[in-house]
Amino acid sequence: MEFLERSNVFGDPKSANVFLQPVDAQDLSRMEEETESLKALCGHEDWCILAVPVANWNRDLTPWSAPPVFGKEGFGEGAAASLDRILKVIIPSLEAAYPARRYFLAGYSLAGLFALWAGYQSATFAGVAAVSPSVWYPGWSDWAAGHVIRTPRVYLSLGDREEKTRNPLMSQVGACIRRQETMLQQHGTDVTLEWNPGNHFVDPAMRTAKGIAWLLR
């Protein structure tokens, strides 16, 4: 497991409950806060979080191209390659060390969108925590309406002020996540939608911990 740096593993590495969480440098700096919050919420440490570094956030977590929302950097279509690495490299390496585990995906913002999209692509995951996910992403809601998710459990959350933005695309996030919840309910998915206080940038570590804790119930 040469890709598996000790600094990127949190919790019990031998646990049967493994959460794969795509992260950038800022997310990684908050992992200790996230895991301490998770310990407090769960009351146990029967879980392992593997923080999976993402080289290019806008490219590697999105399923198709889209124009920029802020600045000049648009979005790529690298989600398929990122998922392929998780399924064909990371999980087999973990299984070789400690087999018969349950694998989950968790992510914040665009990583939350990636986790949700991956749940439609593969039945490998026992659950997905899409925390403040970028479901405003162009074409996402219509795409999701035409597909059936393959993971049995989904945690959704959003800040109660996230839709109160001047950006016309991002202001749709509230309507989009409500629609997402309804679609999953109609497909018989075990889904919950939790509203957190604040905008997109409030308490990401605690919000992510709450999603993981729900999946551990």
Where do the language-model regions lie?
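Active-site signature of alpha/beta-hydrolase-fold catalytic machinery across serine-
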Residues: 117-121
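The feature captures the conserved acid-bearing segment of alpha/beta-hydrolase catalytic domains
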Residues: 135-215
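A conserved short beta-strand
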Residues: 124-138
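The conserved beta1-alpha1 loop
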Residues: 20-24, 132, 158
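A short loop-to-beta-strand scaffold at the N-terminal edge of the catalytic core in hydrolase folds
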Residues: 1-12
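Serine-hydrolase catalytic machinery in alpha/beta-hydrolase-like enzymes
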Residues: 10-97
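Gly/Ala-rich beta-loop-alpha elbow adjacent to hydrolase catalytic centers
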Residues: 106-111, 115
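Alpha/beta-hydrolase-fold catalytic nucleophile elbow
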Residues: 53, 108, 131-132, 157, ...
